[in-house]
Amino acid sequence: MAASARPVGVGGERATSFAMACSLLSRYVRQNGAAAAELGLGIRGEGEAPRAAPGTMSLLPGEAERKKETMELFPQSAGFGQQDAITADSAADAREQEPEKRQLTIFYGGKVLVFNDFPADKAKGLMQLASKGSTVAPQNAVAPAPAAVTDNTKAPMAVPAPVSSLPTAQADAQKPARANASDMPIARKASLHRFLEKRKDRLNAKTPYQASPSDATPVKKEPESQPWLGLGPNAVVKPIERGQ
């Protein structure tokens, strides 16, 4: 009995010694929590807060943005908004590329020519071409021959050369010029003769006396013929005297 009780006592002593060792270890860990953490036992001290797990630093920040996928709840391709915006932008670009057009009016040969929606650059080229030409056109100018229209299916037609009428026009213009040059002295002499005659008449009318008595023209006196009540030309009219 005594032998059997001894081992029981020995086991109880072992259990108590192990419990004491555990209690001492836990007390030590609580008191020295930093040292236990360094050992990596997973035991923290009494006043120590739980530590967050260390995170990894990404050396390529663009990878996270690539992985993000956005979900479009209102896609524009399903409606008409994006298409209308594209058409409006294309129309604005076309307007910017298209040259400005205005109305062009040309006065030529006594006629008025009006062209609508004429490009501005072509109008400038036309003005430069007109300024290069002669400023004074001849009176009998030859009309330009129409340009020949070439057609691949038909044989080319020969355009007749225009007959110039400038030599005949110059000859006709020289004839009256020569005639006027020959008539100039005669016309001047006639006008000078008329002027001298008028001047002579004015001088004769303004002279206060005659140059000689022979030059004086006799003045013919006509008998007085004053009829008085039908008595004839020789009737004598006596004045009537009023009595006082």
Swiss-Prot record:
Keyword Transmembrane: no
Motif (Nuclear localization signal): 187-194
Family statement drawn from the similarity comment of this UniProt entry: Belongs to the TIFY/JAZ family.
Keyword Glycoprotein: no
GO cellular component: nucleus
Protein name, per record: Protein TIFY 10b
Annotated keywords: Jasmonic acid signaling pathway, Nucleus, Transcription, Transcription regulation, Ubl conjugation
Subcellular location: Nucleus
Record function comment: Repressor of jasmonate responses.
All copies of domain Tify, residue ranges: 97-132
Motif (Jas): 185-210
Post-translational modification: Ubiquitinated. Targeted for degradation by the SCF(COI1) E3 ubiquitin ligase-proteasome pathway during jasmonate signaling.
A Gene Ontology BP annotation from the UniProt entry: regulation of jasmonic acid mediated signaling pathway
Domain remarks: The jas domain (185-210) is required for interaction with COI1.
PANTHER family according to UniProt: PROTEIN TIFY 10B (PTHR33077:SF140), PROTEIN TIFY 4A-RELATED-RELATED (PTHR33077)
Listed Basic and acidic residues bias regions: 194-204
Organism expressing this protein natively: Oryza sativa subsp. indica
UniProt gene name: TIFY10B
SMART domains recorded: TIFY
Domain of life, per lineage: Eukaryota
Region: Disordered, residue numbers: 193-244
